[in-house]
Swiss-Prot record:
Catalyzes the formation of CDP-2,3-bis-(O-geranylgeranyl)-sn-glycerol (CDP-archaeol) from 2,3-bis-(O-geranylgeranyl)-sn-glycerol 1-phosphate (DGGGP) and CTP. This reaction is the third ether-bond-formation step in the biosynthesis of archaeal membrane lipids. Its cofactor is Mg(2+). GO terms for cellular component: plasma membrane. Keywords: Cell membrane, Lipid biosynthesis, Lipid metabolism, Magnesium, Membrane, Phospholipid biosynthesis, Phospholipid metabolism, Transferase, Transmembrane, Transmembrane helix. InterPro entries: CarS, CarS_archaea. It comes from the Archaea. Pathway: Membrane lipid metabolism; glycerophospholipid metabolism. The chain crosses the membrane at residues 5-25, 43-63, 91-111, 116-136, 147-167, 175-195. This is CDP-archaeol synthase. It comes from Thermofilum pendens (strain DSM 2475 / Hrk 5). It is an enzyme of class 2 (transferase). It is a multi-pass membrane protein.
Amino acid sequence: MRISVYACFLGLYFLVFSLIVYVILGAEFLVSVLQPGNVARSMLWVLPAYVANASPVVFSRLVRKRWRLHPMDFGLTFVDGQRLLGDNKTFEGFLGGMLSGVLVGILLAYARFVDGVSAFLLPLGALLGDLGGAFVKRRLRIKPGEPAILLDQLDFVAGALILQGLFSKLPAAEVVVAVVLLTPIVHLLTNMAAFVLGLKDVPW
């Protein structure tokens, strides 16, 4: 898939989601969501999840230079004959993502952008959500590295928000909406940067 087409789909998502928020919650709420202060607060709050989601590919590349990686599905297949998760979801990557996300979470908790519980829940939820997304992609016969628009961008955020909501409390509605609205765009931009730097094989 061409990156320009991918970006167009995400732009369309932004417009449609914004319209839905406008219709349901009103113009004033949408304006408050997109205020720079709220955007900055939202990105800082979700940063542990972002870091946890982005780190596994880096850790896996570092580890596989000297050691063998261990896939989390142990090479097992589902009833459809396809792998449960695939070789790209490894214990090393999961551990690296968790450690990185928690470290960032602790720093943000020290600065009082998140609480101590969120410093753990957000990275763990993001990684579990990413595994759930990988499971769905394998069922759809989408190979590792191939794009699945919106699923790739929102699976880890959904996992982080769900785990946070189950075991702690979610932030203000404006923060949650900003995270869901802006994450696909942030995800694409950071992945493009990682691709340019040689950290990823594909720009999505």
